[in-house]
Structures are given as structure tokens and as C-alpha cells.
Amino acid sequence: MDIQKNTSLTFLFYDYETFGKNPALDKPSQFSCIQTDIDFNIIGSIQEIFCYPSVDYLPDPESVLITGISPKYTSLFGVNEFEFAKKIYSLFMKSDTCIIGYNNIYFDDEFTRNIFYRNFLNSYEWSWKNGNSRWDMLDLLRACYVLRPEGINWPRNEDNSVSLRLSDISLANNIVHNVAHNASSDVYATMNIAKLIKQKKPKLFNFFFKYRTKKAILTLIDVNSLNPIVYISRFFGVVNRYISYIVPILWHPINSNILVSIDLSQDVQKILNFFKRNSILNVNYKEIFLMGIRFIYVNRCPILIPTNVIRMKDRIRLRINYKLFQNNLVLLRKNIFLKKKLKKFLCSIAEAPKYNGSNVDLKMYNSFFSYIDNNVIKNIHSTLPKRIKINFMKYDNRINQLFILFLARYRPDMLDYSEKYFWIQRYLNIFSYANIQKYENKILKLIVKYKNHVRNVQLLEELFEYVKYTRKNFLKSIFTN
């Protein structure tokens, strides 16, 4: 679909700043978003929300230094994560919204899913329901650099490799980006990069807009013909110009979102010899990945294009060994046994190992909630702030575990005796003497490292005091309820 014909569509550019890098374990500190029409005219005003962390969490000191956002600041000007999640969910669930970030597919979207999961909101519907979709400007910019670099300034690192950092790209192209690692500033910069690409490369912009959804991407893929397509990804690295020719060979028999393909830049004969010699019982994922088997997640907006997009001058510029690709393709087509062997191997291996530990925050990807489970989750929202009276034992056990943590974090007065005991034990594990010593030593080392940097020292001292305050406040909240 031509983007100009979709007049009801809006873009929502967004960004998080966080207290750490792990989407399941770390917490958000700031969210910002701007909504625009398809011509990048801003609708309404920028939305900015700060979020203070729950008491069972230690912010990463280095992340605080990067963003300049301290937990003290968020406690003064922010909301708790439950209120934070509800506000974001209401923005994301507006129909016909394309939700866009910069490296959001692998970072911000993962934080979104986990934030919604912890707070009884659907982790996935926001990105596909009611005509919604998602898109990543970093991947689009990378595709632009690989395919049609003319007209955009490409900054360089010290080793002369291209830099796709948001701050560097913005500076090189006269895009205002006042404060790096500030969500509001990053959002404006991301929007203007999208605008730049659409102005300079309208055909490329429209092509990848059309093929941003799983449904559209599937039309580019034929696993039966063994015809190659071009794949552009950070996976290949700047050394390989982020590009390779791949051959789709089959759909993963367990996860239908995974396209199993062969990388034609690798030694295909080695792959064939390996599967001829080895029983599937002696094969593992690491080995096949190193040899050139590629898993492409079609629900993550991969950059896939027909081979005819690559012109002769592109092959020369990108130093593509086209003869190698052709020879490997001939080999593959002569050895159709590989497809059967791969399928048998993939069927013999269970799904990716599920997390079986006690921390429910890490269990989002263990499985989808059922339709019945999702109805229970909706009921939790509708009955709050009263305590819902449901026999959680009848449902997915994660719901009960999440609910106990939810009450402990936001309504500790509602905990019964056994739940309170669980909460205290969890807290004592996180804030054990050894953990606190290690954490405080890390802060002290950073204070020494940045002793001449007033801002950093102030942030670290605030963090030191915050930990003391949190420990004191936790004990108070438990023993006064």
C-alpha cells in the first residue's frame, strides 16, 4: 500500500530511558512520544512520563550516569510503573498507529512487552491489533546506507566505519538533537530522521513501509523454489556491509515466526558435508549458526528485498562476491536432502529452554497466556484497587505470582501473611549484605573515577542515599501494614 493513500494512519515515535539494559529485570525511568500524520505534522503535544522504580530493585549506576535521570528525580516527578504502563498502553492502543523507535525492535519494544506483562496488560496486541504495526528507524536507516546512500551524510567512527548512532547521524545531517539519552530529544531526532529518509529516498521509504508487517514480508518469501533474497541486518556487521544473499529453505517446525535460511556468503559445501557426516543427535544450534544457517524472525520487521534491487554498481560498491553466491546456490539446489535433514534436526530439539527459576519477571516468554487467562487478567484491572477474589490456582501460575508482586510493589497493605513472608524473603535476597556491599563498592569506584565530574558525582551520591532510603522505607512499609 502506498503510504500516501493511507490517510487514517498516524505515526507514534517513542523512546525509553531506563535504569538498566535488561528488559525483564530492569526498570524504565522515562517515556516520551510524539504522534504525527503520514507527512510528519505533529498531532497534539509531546507526551513525557517519568517512572520511579519499585523498592525491590537496584538501578544500574552506569545507566543513571548515561541518562542523568536519578531514582530520586523520578520519585519527585514520576509515577509508579503501574500508572506508567496504563498511560503508555492507552497511547499505543489507538487504532491505525504505526509505532516507531530507533533500535526499538530489540530494545524499547522489549521493555514495552515486559512493562505490560508485569502490570497485567497485553504484551503483544499493541503492535498488531486494530490496524497497528511497528517499525524501526535504525533498520530503515541501515537499509538506506546499504542500498541507496546518496543524499544523506554518513558520519564515521575513528576506524572509518560508518556510525549509525542517533546522535552522530543527527549531527551529520543538521538534525536537532539537544540531549543524547533523553527520551524527548531522541524522539524528535528519530522523527526527523524518518522525515529525512522520506524526503531523500521516497521510493525506499515507501517500499519498506509496505513490507514492515509480517503479512507483507511473507509475500517476499518462497521456501519451495530455493530462490535467493537479500537480507540486510546488523547481524552481518559493518565489515560485511550489513548485507548478504540468503536462500529461504523452510519454516521452523516449532516456531512459525522463524524463517530458516542459508547464508550464501558462507561455505555451503561445509554445511552439506557436515549434515552428510553427522547424525542429527550430534548437532547443536551453535554449530549450524557458525556454518551459515540463519534464523530470521518475520515478526521483527526484517529487511528483506528481492535480488533485482541490487544493481551491478551496488555489487561493486558493496564488494559482493556474486560468483560465490551463484556457486553456493547451485550446490544447494543439487542437494535437496539438506532441507529434510534440517527439518528433522529442528523437530528433534525441543523449544528454546524455558526459564524454570522462581522469578516470575523472567517468565514472559515461557508461553502465551490463554484466552481464559487473559480474561482473568482483564478482571484484575477492572477490580483494582480492591483485591480480586479469584482462585488463581485454576489458571496459569504466573498470574498468581505476578499478582503477589504487584500487590507487594503497589499495595503492600493488601498482602496476607504468607504473601508478606514471600515478599520479605525476595527483598532480603536482592538486598542481601553481599549484594549491597558489591553495589555500594561499585558506586564508590565510580565516584573516584568521576571525581572531577560534578554532575556524575552528584548522581552517584544521590543513588547511594536512595539505596539507604529504600531499605529503610521497605521495612517501614512492611511492618506498619
Curated annotation (Swiss-Prot):
Needed cofactors: Mg(2+)
Annotated catalysed reactions: Exonucleolytic cleavage in the 3'- to 5'-direction to yield nucleoside 5'-phosphates
Domain annotation ExoI C-terminal: ranges: 356-471
EC number(s) given by UniProt: 3.1.11.1
A biological process from GO: DNA repair
Keywords: DNA damage, DNA repair, DNA-binding, Exonuclease, Hydrolase, Magnesium, Metal-binding, Nuclease
Feature type site, description Important for activity: 181
GO molecular function, one term: 5'-deoxyribose-5-phosphate lyase activity
Binding positions for Mg(2+) 1 per the UniProt entry: 15
CDD domains per the UniProt record, alphabetical: ExoI_N (cd06138)
Protein name per its UniProtKB record: Exodeoxyribonuclease I
Gene source species: Buchnera aphidicola subsp. Baizongia pistaciae (strain Bp)
